[in-house]
């Protein structure tokens, strides 16, 4: 396991990491995303869902797929449609999460493939705005986010640390694995125990993080 004194930064994903997937926010985001793709391509929502599942998995984000394969050039309209004001209605502060984060004596930052306005809404609703020194969003990474190596490197460089000194926590195996491949330390949030076969260090939620770091 890890010892916190070996680390200089805790770098956290946002969605389905700082709050449980079971809250339903990701479901709402995906529905809006499918609707946007359907309107842009002029196809049914069901067809958009199928096409996203087939093609977007080859990219870091749906936005990157649309840009590369579909000639998409209006990311701001995409962000506005997928992340409207009030989207955070289903979230609420979690005292256990607050205690867990406060128990980890490391600077903390967010690395997300979403836009900053979404990230700040989520952090405010969760009561976590003052727990993070920085938010590195998709614009910070020139719309090429995780799992591109430069996304992780930029975040660590901006935080003044090396990748090897950073623990990155995410709910997506491919994003955690990409960070591990760079020599960093990675941890997967696997709330529903779906990824036992991935061979990655795992916790069910961030409330387990202090115990994970303290384990021998």
Regions found by a protein language model. Name each.
Residues 89, 93, 111, 144:
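Residue-level marker of regulatory loop/turn positions in helix-turn-helix DNA-binding domains and
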Residues 96-106:
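A short, Lys/Arg-enriched amphipathic alpha-helix followed by its capping loop at the start of a domain
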Residues 22, 37, 55, 67, ...:
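Generic anion/oxyanion-binding catalytic loop in active/binding sites
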Residues 3-98, 117:
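N-terminal helical cap/lid subdomain that shapes the substrate entry/recognition surface
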Residues 2-8, 102, 109, 115-216:
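Asp-based, Mg2+/Mn2+-dependent phosphohydrolase catalytic module
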């Amino acid at each position: 396991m890890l010892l916190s004194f070996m680390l200089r930064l805790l770098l956290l994903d946002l969605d389905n990491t700082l709050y449980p997937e079971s809250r339903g926010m990701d479901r709402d985001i995906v529905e809006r995303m499918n609707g946007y793709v359907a309107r842009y391509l002029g196809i049914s929502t069901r067809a958009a869902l199928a096409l996203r599942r087939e093609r977007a998995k080859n990219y870091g984000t749906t936005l990157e797929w649309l840009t590369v394969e579909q000639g998409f050039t209006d990311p701001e309209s995409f962000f506005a449609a997928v992340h409207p004001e009030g989207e955070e209605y289903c979230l609420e502060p979690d005292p256990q999460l607050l205690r867990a984060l406060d128990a980890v004596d490391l600077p903390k930052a967010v690395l997300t493939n979403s836009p900053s306005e979404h990230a700040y809404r989520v952090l405010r609703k969760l009561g976590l705005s003052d727990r993070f020194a920085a938010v590195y969003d998709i614009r910070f990474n020139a719309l090429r986010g995780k799992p591109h190596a430069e996304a992780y490197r930029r975040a660590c460089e901006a935080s003044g640390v090396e990748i090897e000194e950073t623990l990155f926590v995410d709910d997506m195996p491919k994003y955690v694995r990409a960070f591990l491949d760079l020599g960093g330390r990675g941890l997967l949030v696997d709330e529903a125990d779906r990824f036992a076969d991935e061979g990655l260090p795992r916790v069910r939620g961030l409330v387990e993080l202090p115990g994970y770091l303290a384990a021998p």
